[in-house]
Amino acid sequence: MAPRPLLLLLLLLGGSAARPAPPRARRHSDGTFTSELSRLREGARLQRLLQGLVGKRSEQDAENSMAWTRLSAGLLCPSGSNMPILQAWMPLDGTWSPWLPPGPMVSEPAGAAAEGTLRPR
């Protein structure tokens, strides 16, 4: 009688060890996790890229602001030697922009701009 339970035990244990486990079916939660992870990784990569660009931009902004300050100081207070430089900035057709109203521009002398204005008595 002892061989019968032993045989039954061997059949149960041997049968389960002989068959490989069926492959696990892909679940919706696996895809959700994978897509969420990919999205988070992409967001982190873009954030690092933007931080790198902003860091570079802030360094460039400091350099550019200094250059514009120097340039604007020369444009706002032109000396006689800078006048050809100012005229070089004027477009060839004499119009600055189609959106700006016609009138005196930077390259025109101040006397022409002052003509026709009323002076207080």
Swiss-Prot record:
- Keyword Phosphoprotein attached: yes
Q: Name one GO molecular function term.
A: digestive hormone activity
List, alphabetically, the SMART domains matched. Answer: GLUCA
Explain what induces or represses this protein's expression: Serum secretin levels are increased after single-meal ingestion.
Q: Which UniProt keywords apply?
A: Amidation, Cleavage on pair of basic residues, Hormone, Phosphoprotein, Secreted, Signal
**Which residues are the signal sequence here?**
1-18
Residues that make up the propeptide are: 19-26, 58-121
| InterPro entries referenced in this protein's UniProt entry, alphabetically | Glucagon_GIP_secretin_VIP, Prosecretin
Where is it localised? Answer: Secreted
In this chain, where does the modification Phosphoserine occur? S58
Q: Valine amide-modified residues are where?
A: V54
One Gene Ontology cellular component term attached to this UniProt record is: extracellular region
Kindly state a single biological-process term from the GO annotations of this entry.
regulation of synaptic plasticity
Recorded hits in PROSITE patterns, A to Z, give: GLUCAGON (PS00260)
Protein family membership? Belongs to the glucagon family.
Summarizing the function annotation, the protein's role is: Hormone involved in different processes, such as regulation of the pH of the duodenal content, food intake and water homeostasis. Exerts its biological effects by binding to secretin receptor (SCTR), a G-protein coupled receptor expressed in the basolateral domain of several cells. Acts as a key gastrointestinal hormone by regulating the pH of the duodenal content.
Q: What name appears for this protein in its UniProt entry?
A: Secretin
* Provenance organism: Homo sapiens
Q: Which gene encodes it?
A: SCT
